[in-house]
């Protein structure tokens, strides 16, 4: 459909026509709308245990989970924390909370206790649903706040087993839920700063899923005959939205993996004839480079969705040699955007030819524009600028943070992504840089400000700055520039260990460079571009070596 000019603003739209989206219903009503057709079909399969649940059983489990959570005091407007790896109980709990008009805040079970406590406190969690590997991380918070803890994989002192939650009678009727009520509360660092609660409503998630899988020619063609691999963590919005919710809406079968293991992945693909494989580039790298994986192993896969981080042409070519029967394409998203901004049109029921390196075209029923990051002026085709998106799929705002919301969504409803890219003559979007400070380690967000705030609590660190450094396997890794206090001889290894005790594995500092000062502008903001330029020039290694040999100073 190309671009249209309105008040000198160049607006880009999908090549696919807009569709009618009924986002006046609740998310669970939307996901189970085809129950009469798919009720007896397999819905969720636990890849680890082999246990299978039909659509009717999943819907019933969500009603029982709702009743059980209500008995624990959860009601409309409350928040349930899901601190889980992928498992069927994640879906039961999420959908159950939705029926009560409650929201689920998703968190990584490998977070440190400090990270878990901070999110649970900020979100106002009323109940925490977790598992054995994380239960000890929540005990102190739960005891202090009187928050019940539910465990999905066994009995633990002071905790409620999830099977007890499911023992409740089915909820007779859902709560009176408004489309603009919050249903998901993932945490994101946005374009800068510490993690913030992203308020995604029933309306926004329905709109986002519909933009992908609804319509006569859906952008993302899932069918009830497809078997989707759910390997990417459901606590990440990409997997929750484009795998679980999109799969439920389409009536597909979803095979759940708790963690990535290449051998187990191949076994599940063969056993269940997996047809849809949502991956991130680090998984693609491992498959491409593994001599153990053959084209025969992965022959059933017809579609590989890659999101969360860019992927180059050389990697694509090596990977496709292993999955010759599949279409490979990329999407582009941001938690605050609902999360999908763009999707590869090669995934459509009636596919389009796409270019390598593109992250797709803007989703239907949405508008996208490119603006000059300095002036805000709207830019045309093939001109790089900040990507902005508008539509009913974007977040309601940040929880309890109107200032951050105002800085992200402008008065005209445009969400500013902080990503730099352009739209070419064929409406395909290319990402070229990032305005925002967030580091992407294997698709996971690493906010520099969080690490900097932690680093300067060390008595031997006077100042610190964290930036990204390119890495072949991870995409990016966090590295720290450190100014020591006068007389300090703190080492790189000591700093790494100090950070590692407080943060999840992917936020750990990869390398430390000692320096005399951190470059800042007159207002005190760290000049990260200057530090990245030093990395690109190879200067930090010399600085680090000199610092190791020289007397320590401030």
Curated annotation (Swiss-Prot):
The keyword Transcription regulation appears for this protein: no
Induction of expression: Induced by wounding. Down-regulated by UV irradiation.
Summary of the tissues where the protein is detected: Expressed in root exodermis and epidermis cells, stem vascular cells, leaf developing vascular bundle cells and parenchyma cells, lemma, palea, stamens and pistil.
Pathway participation: Phytoalexin biosynthesis; 3,4',5-trihydroxystilbene biosynthesis; 3,4',5-trihydroxystilbene from trans-4-coumarate: step 1/2
Keyword annotations of the record: ATP-binding, Ligase, Magnesium, Nucleotide-binding, Phenylpropanoid metabolism
Residues binding ATP: 188-192, 196, 330-331, 335, 419, 434, 525
Binding-site residues, (E)-4-coumaroyl-AMP: 238, 242, 308, 330-331, 335, 343, 436, 440
Keyword Transmembrane helix (UniProt): no
GO molecular function: (E)-caffeate-CoA ligase activity; 4-coumarate-CoA ligase activity; ATP binding; CoA-ligase activity; trans-cinnamate-CoA ligase activity; trans-feruloyl-CoA synthase activity
Main function: Involved in the phenylpropanoid metabolism by mediating the activation of a number of hydroxycinnamates for the biosynthesis of monolignols and other phenolic secondary metabolites. Catalyzes the formation of CoA esters of cinnamate, 4-coumarate, caffeate and ferulate. Is more efficient with substrates in the following order: ferulate > 4-coumarate > caffeate > cinnamate. Possesses very high activity compared to 4CL1, 4CL2, 4CL4 and 4CL5. Cannot convert sinapate to its corresponding CoA ester. May play a role in the synthesis of lignin as well as other phenolic compounds.
Name by which UniProt lists this protein: 4-coumarate--CoA ligase 3
Organism: Oryza sativa subsp. japonica
Chain's gene name: 4CL3
